[in-house]
């Protein structure tokens, strides 16, 4: 009877391909990469405009 009750428990818990920490690490790395891809072009434009138009940023 114990073997019958243990087999559905094993069927309920699936075997993960990766550990939970690896999945969380991949998700966090994806968020960091997507954020940098989103913010880096805007930062480059701001730096370019500050260098090419020095009157606007307060330099005389």
Curated annotation (Swiss-Prot):
The domain of life is: Eukaryota
Q: What is the lineage of its organism?
A: Eukaryota, Metazoa, Chordata, Craniata, Vertebrata
Q: Which residues are annotated as site, described as Cleavage?
A: 19-20
| CC per GO annotation | membrane
Where in the cell? Membrane
| Membrane topology according to the record | Single-pass membrane protein
Segments spanning the bilayer are: 20-40
Mind listing the GO molecular function terms for this protein? identical protein binding
* Keywords from the named record: Membrane, Transmembrane, Transmembrane helix
Query: Which Pfam families does its entry note?
Result: Smim3
Do you know which PANTHER family this protein is assigned to?
SMALL INTEGRAL MEMBRANE PROTEIN 3
InterPro entries, per database record: Smim3
Name recorded for this polypeptide: Small integral membrane protein 3
């Amino acid at each position: 009877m114990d073997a019958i009750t243990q087999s559905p428990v094993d069927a309920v818990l699936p075997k993960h391909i990766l550990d939970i920490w690896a999945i969380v690490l991949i998700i966090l790395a994806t968020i960091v990469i997507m954020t940098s891809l989103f913010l880096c072009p805007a930062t480059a434009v701001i730096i370019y405009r500050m260098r090419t138009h020095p009157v606007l940023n307060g330099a005389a």
